Amino acid sequence: MGTIICIGGLVGLKNKEKVFIPYSPRKIDFEIMKLSTKVNPKVLFIGTASSEREDYYISFKNAYESLGAIVENLCVLNNNITFEEIRKKILSSDIIYVGCGKTKFMMDVWKSKGIDKCLIEAYKKDIILAGMSAGSYCWFKYNYEMIEGLDLIHMINCVHYDEKSKEKKKQFYDNIKKNNLRGIAIDNDASLIFSGTDYKIVKNYENSKAYDIVFEDGKYIEKEII
Protein backbone atom coordinates (compact mmCIF):
# COMPACT_ATOMS: atom_id res chain seq x y z
CA MET A 1 0.00 0.00 0.00
CA GLY A 2 1.02 3.60 -0.54
CA THR A 3 2.14 6.56 1.48
CA ILE A 4 -0.15 9.43 2.52
CA ILE A 5 0.96 12.89 3.72
CA CYS A 6 -1.72 14.78 5.68
CA ILE A 7 -1.09 18.50 6.20
CA GLY A 8 -2.96 20.53 8.81
CA GLY A 9 -2.73 23.81 6.90
CA LEU A 10 -0.25 26.45 5.83
CA VAL A 11 -0.01 29.92 7.36
CA GLY A 12 0.46 32.64 4.76
CA LEU A 13 -1.08 30.79 1.83
CA LYS A 14 -3.58 33.62 1.22
CA ASN A 15 -3.44 37.40 1.63
CA LYS A 16 -6.00 39.55 3.46
CA GLU A 17 -8.24 39.54 0.39
CA LYS A 18 -8.27 35.69 0.49
CA VAL A 19 -6.25 35.50 -2.73
CA PHE A 20 -3.70 32.68 -2.98
CA ILE A 21 -0.23 34.20 -3.14
CA PRO A 22 3.21 32.87 -4.11
CA TYR A 23 4.97 30.97 -1.36
CA SER A 24 8.40 29.48 -0.96
CA PRO A 25 8.48 25.70 -0.44
CA ARG A 26 8.74 24.69 3.21
CA LYS A 27 10.05 21.61 4.95
CA ILE A 28 6.87 19.61 4.33
CA ASP A 29 7.04 20.31 0.59
CA PHE A 30 10.65 19.13 0.45
CA GLU A 31 9.65 15.98 2.36
CA ILE A 32 6.86 15.20 -0.11
CA MET A 33 9.27 15.51 -3.02
CA LYS A 34 11.84 13.30 -1.27
CA LEU A 35 9.31 10.48 -1.02
CA SER A 36 9.48 10.05 -4.78
CA THR A 37 12.52 8.25 -6.16
CA LYS A 38 12.41 10.40 -9.30
CA VAL A 39 14.45 13.56 -9.86
CA ASN A 40 11.53 15.20 -11.69
CA PRO A 41 8.38 13.50 -10.41
CA LYS A 42 5.01 14.11 -12.02
CA VAL A 43 2.84 15.91 -9.47
CA LEU A 44 -0.90 16.10 -10.07
CA PHE A 45 -2.72 18.93 -8.29
CA ILE A 46 -6.41 18.37 -7.52
CA GLY A 47 -8.13 21.64 -6.59
CA THR A 48 -11.74 20.47 -6.53
CA ALA A 49 -12.33 21.72 -2.97
CA SER A 50 -11.47 25.32 -3.95
CA SER A 51 -13.61 25.06 -7.11
CA GLU A 52 -10.36 24.76 -9.09
CA ARG A 53 -9.21 28.31 -8.41
CA GLU A 54 -6.53 29.33 -10.87
CA ASP A 55 -4.62 31.48 -8.35
CA TYR A 56 -4.27 28.44 -6.06
CA TYR A 57 -2.99 26.22 -8.85
CA ILE A 58 -0.46 28.82 -10.00
CA SER A 59 0.82 29.31 -6.44
CA PHE A 60 1.22 25.55 -6.00
CA LYS A 61 2.70 25.01 -9.46
CA ASN A 62 5.38 27.65 -9.01
CA ALA A 63 6.39 26.27 -5.60
CA TYR A 64 6.70 22.67 -6.76
CA GLU A 65 8.31 23.46 -10.10
CA SER A 66 11.03 25.22 -8.13
CA LEU A 67 11.70 21.83 -6.51
CA GLY A 68 11.96 20.07 -9.86
CA ALA A 69 8.43 18.70 -10.17
CA ILE A 70 6.50 18.42 -13.42
CA VAL A 71 3.14 19.81 -12.30
CA GLU A 72 -0.23 19.14 -13.90
CA ASN A 73 -3.74 20.18 -12.92
CA LEU A 74 -6.81 17.92 -12.75
CA CYS A 75 -9.84 20.01 -13.74
CA VAL A 76 -13.20 18.26 -13.72
CA LEU A 77 -15.64 21.14 -13.21
CA ASN A 78 -17.36 22.78 -16.18
CA ASN A 79 -15.78 20.53 -18.77
CA ASN A 80 -16.46 17.23 -20.50
CA ILE A 81 -13.52 15.23 -19.15
CA THR A 82 -14.27 11.51 -19.18
CA PHE A 83 -13.71 8.94 -16.45
CA GLU A 84 -11.05 7.29 -18.61
CA GLU A 85 -9.18 10.61 -18.94
CA ILE A 86 -9.39 11.22 -15.19
CA ARG A 87 -8.14 7.73 -14.41
CA LYS A 88 -5.24 8.03 -16.85
CA LYS A 89 -4.14 11.36 -15.34
CA ILE A 90 -4.30 10.05 -11.79
CA LEU A 91 -2.58 6.72 -12.41
CA SER A 92 0.21 8.25 -14.51
CA SER A 93 1.25 10.54 -11.64
CA ASP A 94 4.06 9.97 -9.14
CA ILE A 95 2.57 12.27 -6.50
CA ILE A 96 -1.03 13.46 -6.09
CA TYR A 97 -1.66 16.61 -4.03
CA VAL A 98 -5.20 17.57 -2.99
CA GLY A 99 -5.74 21.23 -2.12
CA CYS A 100 -7.80 22.93 0.57
CA GLY A 101 -11.37 24.19 0.42
CA LYS A 102 -14.85 22.75 0.94
CA THR A 103 -14.65 19.10 1.93
CA LYS A 104 -18.24 18.00 1.29
CA PHE A 105 -18.38 19.70 -2.10
CA MET A 106 -15.13 17.98 -3.07
CA MET A 107 -16.28 14.52 -1.95
CA ASP A 108 -19.62 14.90 -3.75
CA VAL A 109 -17.88 15.87 -7.00
CA TRP A 110 -15.40 13.02 -6.66
CA LYS A 111 -18.16 10.46 -6.23
CA SER A 112 -20.08 11.80 -9.22
CA LYS A 113 -16.97 11.67 -11.43
CA GLY A 114 -15.42 8.43 -10.13
CA ILE A 115 -12.36 10.25 -8.77
CA ASP A 116 -12.77 8.49 -5.42
CA LYS A 117 -12.33 5.09 -7.08
CA CYS A 118 -9.28 6.31 -9.03
CA LEU A 119 -7.58 7.63 -5.89
CA ILE A 120 -8.12 4.35 -4.04
CA GLU A 121 -6.61 2.57 -7.04
CA ALA A 122 -3.66 5.00 -6.97
CA TYR A 123 -3.10 4.18 -3.30
CA LYS A 124 -3.01 0.47 -4.07
CA LYS A 125 -0.44 1.15 -6.80
CA ASP A 126 1.85 2.95 -4.30
CA ILE A 127 1.38 6.40 -5.84
CA ILE A 128 2.21 9.00 -3.19
CA LEU A 129 -0.89 10.79 -1.90
CA ALA A 130 -0.78 14.16 -0.15
CA GLY A 131 -3.08 16.99 0.74
CA MET A 132 -3.82 19.92 2.98
CA SER A 133 -6.93 20.67 5.05
CA ALA A 134 -9.78 19.23 2.91
CA GLY A 135 -6.93 17.44 1.16
CA SER A 136 -6.09 15.80 4.48
CA TYR A 137 -9.68 15.00 5.44
CA CYS A 138 -10.30 13.10 2.21
CA TRP A 139 -7.95 10.24 3.14
CA PHE A 140 -9.60 9.56 6.54
CA LYS A 141 -12.79 7.71 7.47
CA TYR A 142 -14.31 11.00 8.67
CA ASN A 143 -13.41 14.58 9.40
CA TYR A 144 -14.35 16.06 12.77
CA GLU A 145 -17.79 17.04 11.38
CA MET A 146 -18.40 13.45 10.21
CA ILE A 147 -18.02 14.20 6.51
CA GLU A 148 -16.99 10.87 5.06
CA GLY A 149 -13.67 10.47 3.27
CA LEU A 150 -12.07 7.59 1.38
CA ASP A 151 -11.29 5.61 4.57
CA LEU A 152 -7.70 4.89 3.54
CA ILE A 153 -6.89 5.94 7.11
CA HIS A 154 -9.50 4.47 9.46
CA MET A 155 -9.56 7.39 11.89
CA ILE A 156 -11.19 10.80 12.41
CA ASN A 157 -9.18 13.87 11.40
CA CYS A 158 -9.20 17.48 12.57
CA VAL A 159 -6.93 19.99 10.80
CA HIS A 160 -6.08 23.63 11.65
CA TYR A 161 -6.22 22.27 15.20
CA ASP A 162 -4.31 25.17 16.73
CA GLU A 163 -7.03 27.59 15.65
CA LYS A 164 -10.14 25.48 16.25
CA SER A 165 -12.72 26.85 18.69
CA LYS A 166 -13.63 25.03 21.90
CA GLU A 167 -16.98 24.10 20.33
CA LYS A 168 -15.35 22.48 17.29
CA LYS A 169 -12.82 20.64 19.43
CA LYS A 170 -15.70 19.32 21.55
CA GLN A 171 -17.45 18.16 18.38
CA PHE A 172 -14.27 16.36 17.36
CA TYR A 173 -13.93 14.69 20.78
CA ASP A 174 -17.61 13.71 20.88
CA ASN A 175 -17.35 12.01 17.49
CA ILE A 176 -14.22 10.10 18.55
CA LYS A 177 -16.20 8.69 21.48
CA LYS A 178 -19.44 8.01 19.55
CA ASN A 179 -17.71 6.16 16.74
CA ASN A 180 -15.05 4.43 18.83
CA LEU A 181 -12.35 5.68 16.47
CA ARG A 182 -8.92 7.14 17.01
CA GLY A 183 -8.64 10.86 16.35
CA ILE A 184 -5.75 12.62 14.65
CA ALA A 185 -5.43 16.38 15.14
CA ILE A 186 -2.95 18.40 13.07
CA ASP A 187 -1.93 22.05 13.52
CA ASN A 188 -1.18 24.48 10.73
CA ASP A 189 2.31 23.88 9.29
CA ALA A 190 2.41 20.34 10.66
CA SER A 191 1.93 17.10 8.76
CA LEU A 192 1.79 13.37 9.35
CA ILE A 193 3.24 10.86 6.92
CA PHE A 194 1.30 7.58 7.02
CA SER A 195 2.82 4.35 5.76
CA GLY A 196 0.59 1.41 6.55
CA THR A 197 -0.27 1.65 10.25
CA ASP A 198 2.84 3.71 11.06
CA TYR A 199 3.09 7.48 10.95
CA LYS A 200 5.58 10.21 11.72
CA ILE A 201 5.39 13.97 12.07
CA VAL A 202 7.07 16.49 9.79
CA LYS A 203 6.60 20.16 10.58
CA ASN A 204 7.63 23.48 9.14
CA TYR A 205 8.02 25.13 12.53
CA GLU A 206 8.91 23.75 15.95
CA ASN A 207 5.69 24.97 17.60
CA SER A 208 3.45 23.21 15.04
CA LYS A 209 2.09 20.00 16.55
CA ALA A 210 -0.08 16.94 15.97
CA TYR A 211 -2.00 14.80 18.44
CA ASP A 212 -3.30 11.24 18.78
CA ILE A 213 -6.60 11.12 20.68
CA VAL A 214 -8.57 8.14 21.97
CA PHE A 215 -11.44 7.57 24.38
CA GLU A 216 -10.55 4.72 26.73
CA ASP A 217 -11.73 3.63 30.17
CA GLY A 218 -14.20 6.50 30.38
CA LYS A 219 -11.75 9.28 29.56
CA TYR A 220 -10.05 11.01 26.65
CA ILE A 221 -6.32 10.51 26.21
CA GLU A 222 -4.57 13.11 24.06
CA LYS A 223 -0.90 12.49 23.25
CA GLU A 224 1.36 14.76 21.27
CA ILE A 225 2.95 12.95 18.32
CA ILE A 226 6.70 13.49 18.46
Q: Residue spans of the language-model regions?
A:
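A general structural motif
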Residues: M1, K38-V43, S93, D126
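C-terminal and late-domain segments of enzyme folds
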Residues: M1-V39, T48, E54-I58, E145-I226
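Structural motif
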Residues: C6, I95-G99, A130-G131, N157-C158
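Short glycine-rich anion-binding loops that position phosphate/pyrophosphate groups of nucleotides
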Residues: L10, G101-T103, G135
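Short, flexible loop segments at the rims of nucleotide/cofactor-binding pockets, characterized by
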Residues: V19-Y23, E72-L77, M106-V109, Y161-D162
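ATP/NTP phosphate-donor binding region
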Residues: Y23-K27, E31-K89
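Flexible gly/pro-rich beta->alpha loop and the following alpha-helix that scaffold active-site loops
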Residues: V76-I128
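Class I SAM-dependent methyltransferase SAM-binding "motif I" and its flanking Rossmann-like core
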Residues: F105-K169
